Amino acid sequence: MMSACAPEAYAHARRVALGAVATAQTIDLPAPLVEQVEQAGLLHDIGKLAIAERNLGPQELHGDLHAVLLRQHVRVGFDILSVVPHLRSAASIVIALHERWDGFGYPAGLRGAEIPLGARIIAIADAYDVLTSTCAYRSGMSRDAANVEIVRGAGTYFDPDMVRAWLRASDRLECS
């Protein structure tokens, strides 16, 4: 259904899930946890889709209101996913996707290992896909340039150990 309604969002979600699963496998996460990471990767932006459906019509929102709505998307995604029993673990990952390793993220200001491991993994895969994807206002970066940016974010935005795992996983992804 998502592929028909929002094909770009669906393609992004698939790429994020693929990168996140590869990273989770690189650190030998048990299969049930890899499955949770995959589910959360596929559904990580469901809150954005719900907000866009309710609030973005023919006229696009800009500025502060747009920023406020975007910041709410992880809470909305959590609310949607947490009512489905087999997606509750994914919900707890989705709500933490914009937490930062240094504690300056949102919504709870979690830092370091307080952030669920799945969220730390998906945050990197999500950032990488955003950096490498071309959109209306900019061209996507090369894989190498995007990985340089990911490395720059280690210790502030991202878990340094997961950045190292991402780099190993992305090498494998490029070869496949």
Regions found by a protein language model. Give the residues of each.
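Histidine- and acidic-residue-rich, metal-dependent catalytic cores
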Residues: 1-176
